């Protein structure tokens, strides 16, 4: 694996495992952009699915490639290569399409210049959320950014953050990228740190000169965490807060300690089901893993029962597949891995049978020259009349970090009795689901995209969950004490 080290100026590549000492990143960028475009054009279902989601994909596929290729001459390092790849992928406005570095990239806690404070997105505006201790001449916390160097805060955000750092057409994209608005993150395609910015405090506006402050990794991390809720080192745990269980599920990743966590849940299930109620905290539960939905369903089945939750899962409807040899091969390879695992064969014979049926459907569609074919999804389970074992109220706490499989879990949790959704607006995902990953020619990036279309999904394309009135948290999401105190009031 290669680690590319950033610096303030154009710099060379640190080479690991015998790679060449210098690379023409401009050529690599053009090559990777074209390869990503061709892979999506030839295999992504959105290319041939009618409707708004397909139209959005097709409008960017070629136009976005041309736009990104026009910027490739500015690529001069691994960092700028990664930024341009992200720009093209984010332009599809589909959270299930991504181009990520295969090496350790910049990460969220990185800047080469910053003014000693940072902003957060709140109430449709950018406001100061964190100021370095002892910093003089900075706008006070809560000040609203009006403009910088004569450019409005919105126009600055669009030029500097949108597509480069995230999707500003979504609330979650606004929240997660807001700390970077006044930082220089070594993106040569966008402006760096502005010199003069105007902030509003109440009705009064004042211009401040932003001065570069020393870069300290701990300060940069604290500044980001002071503006955006960021899960800690232990994503899975059960605590007791205000006299009731608080179930932390801040990750749905495969490498989290699910065995230990599920053991905790099972040992405390009688308490969880008691009249006092409990909290399921899904903030930051990024769910890009193929198993993310199953992990969340596994938690629900342990707290309630499979007999109670299964009839309340959303109806799957039909799934549309694009009939291409590459997409068929993905299922062939998946089926082979399933059949080679004795435990999976023993425990999941129905999944193997279903996957084999999909491969057969690919063969039939390809032989007939069809572009697509549809398969029925999981049938809705019959309601056996099983009683609800959970006596008390349940609050499910979410934020913009709840994405992908986390949203699938909400599709089911929000259908259970006495469950309320609280917090802030979640992330979004498209109807193009189940990621496939392709290594791009440079070896420095992977393209991932959803390779089948859930055209009948009850939750619409790119539709987030938004807590109802009275259940939306409007304070600083990074103030954990305030968040927990507020959640406690929801049980009163």
Feature names for model-found ranges:
Residues 309, 339-354, 450-473:
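Extended, charge-rich low-complexity interaction segments
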Residues 393-415, 420-429:
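Extended C-terminal subregions enriched in glycine
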Residues 292-376, 384:
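A substrate-binding/cap region within the structured catalytic cores of diverse enzymes
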Residues 22-321, 325-333, 393, 408, ...:
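Flexible, low-complexity junctional segments that flank or bridge functional domains
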Residues 1-8:
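Bacterial N-terminal signal peptides that target proteins for export
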Residues 382-397:
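Short, conserved helix/loop micro-motifs enriched in His/Cys and acidic residues
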Residues 17-19:
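N-terminal signal peptide c-region/cleavage motif recognized by signal peptidases
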Residues 2, 272, 416:
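Acidic-histidine catalytic/liganding microenvironments
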């Amino acid at each position: 694996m290669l680690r590319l080290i950033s610096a303030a100026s154009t710099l060379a590549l640190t080479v690991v495992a015998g790679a060449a000492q210098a690379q023409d990143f401009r050529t690599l960028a053009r090559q990777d952009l074209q390869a990503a475009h061709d892979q999506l054009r030839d295999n992504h279902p959105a290319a041939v699915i009618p409707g708004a989601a397909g139209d959005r994909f097709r409008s960017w596929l070629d136009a976005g490639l041309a736009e990104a290729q026009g910027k490739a001459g500015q690529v001069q390092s691994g960092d700028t290569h990664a930024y341009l790849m992200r720009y093209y992928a984010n332009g599809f406005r589909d959270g299930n399409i991504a181009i990520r570095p295969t090496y350790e990239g910049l990460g969220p806690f990185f800047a080469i210049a910053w003014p000693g404070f940072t902003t957060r997105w709140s109430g449709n505006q950018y406001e100061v959320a964190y100021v370095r201790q002892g910093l003089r001449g900075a706008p006070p916390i809560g000040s609203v950014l009006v403009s910088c160097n004569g450019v409005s805060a919105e126009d600055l955000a669009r030029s500097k953050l949108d597509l480069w750092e995230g999707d500003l057409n979504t609330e979650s994209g606004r929240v997660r990228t807001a700390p970077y608005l006044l930082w220089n993150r070594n993106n040569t395609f966008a402006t760096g740190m502005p010199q003069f910015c105007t902030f509003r405090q109440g009705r009064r506006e004042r211009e401040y000169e932003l001065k570069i402050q020393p870069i300290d990794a701990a300060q940069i991390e604290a500044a980001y965490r002071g503006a955006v809720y960021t899960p800690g080192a232990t994503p899975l745990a059960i605590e007791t807060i205000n006299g009731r269980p608080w179930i932390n599920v801040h990750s749905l990743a495969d490498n989290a300690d699910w065995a230990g966590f599920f053991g905790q849940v099972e040992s405390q299930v009688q308490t969880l089901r008691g009249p006092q109620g409990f909290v399921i905290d899904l903030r930051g539960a990024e769910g890009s893993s193929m198993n993310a939905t199953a992990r969340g369903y596994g938690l629900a089945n342990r707290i309630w029962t499979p007999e109670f939750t299964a009839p309340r899962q959303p109806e799957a409807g039909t799934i549309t597949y694009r009939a291409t040899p590459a997409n068929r091969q993905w299922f062939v390879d998946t089926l082979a891995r399933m059949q080679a695992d004795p435990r999976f064969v023993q425990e999941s014979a129905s999944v193997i049978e279903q996957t084999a049926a999909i491969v057969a459907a690919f063969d039939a569609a390809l032989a007939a020259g069809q572009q697509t074919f549809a398969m029925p999804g999981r049938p809705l389970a019959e309601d056996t009349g099983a009683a609800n074992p959970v006596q008390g109220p349940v609050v499910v706490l979410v934020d913009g970090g709840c994405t992908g499989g986390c949203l699938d879990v909400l599709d089911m949790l929000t259908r259970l009795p006495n469950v309320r959704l609280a917090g802030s607006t979640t992330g979004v995902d498209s109807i193009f689901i189940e990621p496939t990953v392709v290594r791009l020619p440079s070896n420095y990036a992977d393209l991932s995209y959803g390779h089948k279309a859930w055209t009948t999904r009850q939750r619409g394309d790119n539709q987030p969950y938004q807590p109802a009135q009275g259940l939306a948290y409007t304070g600083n999401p990074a103030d954990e004490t305030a968040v927990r105190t507020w959640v406690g009031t929801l049980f009163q």
